[in-house]
Amino acid sequence: MWIPKDENPQTFPKKKIDTPMMMLSVFWGVNGIIAIDILQKPNTMNAQYLIDNVLTQIINSDEFEKSKQQKQKFAIHFDNSRVHKSHKVMNYLVENNVKVVPNPIYSPDIAPSDFYLFGTLKKRAEGREGDLENFVREQFEQFSHDDLKRVFQAWIDRCERVIESNGDYI
């Protein structure tokens, strides 16, 4: 953009370079959050971390306990990352009677959290500083039972479209 010699250029604030990176893992059902974990960089997700910090929360949750009392198998869905599909994680889930809902191999964009919820959370969190975990919990509390049911239905519809398109990108 060209400006006259006697005018000062408009300034724009720079993004903070030192903003810490983190990985947010959220498992939820129609009744709300079941497990949440925030992994700070430089740490990385591996099978043991997933079991100790995320899946253990799920196994100890009220939702999991309800499924056991109703003699139903608890179902979980996640993408096809190596950590999720590792023998260690799969064995842990089998030992705890957890069913894994399969995810199409090349369809990472159908995960309900990634596709439907994280975009909303990201917009709401923009420019915000402070306790991310409490912020995420507060935001999930604002999603109604009907909102979460709609997300599940949209996910089912999207999965059906992936199946109908023989796995092609939709």
PLM regions: where:
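Mobile genetic element proteins and their domesticated derivatives, centered on retroelements
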Residues: 26, 54, 76-79, 93, ...
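Intrinsically disordered, low-complexity regulatory regions enriched in Ser/Pro/Gly/Thr
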Residues: 16-21, 27, 67-70, 92-95, ...
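Cytochrome P450 catalytic-domain "roof"
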Residues: 58-73
